[in-house]
Amino acid sequence: MAVAVRVIPCLDVDAGRVVKGINFEGLRDAGDPVELAHRYDNGGADELTFLDVTASSGNRETTFDVVRRTAEEVFIPLTVGGGVRGVAEVDKLLRYGADKASINTAAVARPDVIDEITRHFGSQVLVLSVDARRTRPGSEPTASGFEVTTHGGRQGTGIDAIEWAREAADRGVGEILLNSIDADGTKDGFDIELIRLVRAAVRVPIIASGGAGKPEHFPPAVAAGADAVLAASIFHFGPVDMISQVKTAIREAGFEVR
């Protein structure tokens, strides 16, 4: 791998608090986002991702004040998502201190928004979040066996997740945040098949998310094609040096880390 693997803690925020659940359900309080952001910055995180997990499903804006306070505490790139619908929200997030914006539900509903945002700000600003799950029994199967979900994993779309990643890359997204809804919060490891399929379909960087439970889970995701690895529970509820442990595991597997 030509560039160093990035390790990214994820702050899933609901009503101004960091939360974590399993398969996006049963949310548990994990702390104050500003305090956690400061801790992860000091602990060696390469970037932070801040997702307002109910902004899209509740049809409300991201909590911009929390974004601003978080951005004031960290000196590493901050990606913010949740409730991003177009150029106006991205512009506001950047003014409040975000470095990149993540979009999911709005892009599925209107793919042209990807072109509009990247034309306005450049590809490097836009991350496409793909919440993918294996197609359910009784539902129409997709070609890859994975479908795109929206509204924080609550709604299936019937859209093939691999084809959607390919289309978004062709439209100009800078990165793909690939989250396995099936693995999310389970601590059983990343969905390696999903990562491999998307890696074969796109050339843009992939951030693998969903399922990390111990440092040993991270190297297989990198080997499958992830350029960065993202997790929440393992960092929120694990020892304070967990970022360092994860980087050590990746390095010992033969991959470069920052």
Swiss-Prot record:
Localization (cell): Cytoplasm
Keywords assigned by UniProt, alphabetized: Amino-acid biosynthesis, Cytoplasm, Histidine biosynthesis, Lyase
One example GO MF annotation: lyase activity
A GO term from the CC aspect: cytoplasm
GO biological process annotation, one example: L-histidine biosynthetic process
Self-association and partners: Heterodimer of HisH and HisF.
Family label: Belongs to the HisA/HisF family.
Protein name: Imidazole glycerol phosphate synthase subunit HisF
Taxonomic path: Bacteria, Bacillati, Actinomycetota, Actinomycetes, Micrococcales
Gene this chain is encoded by: hisF
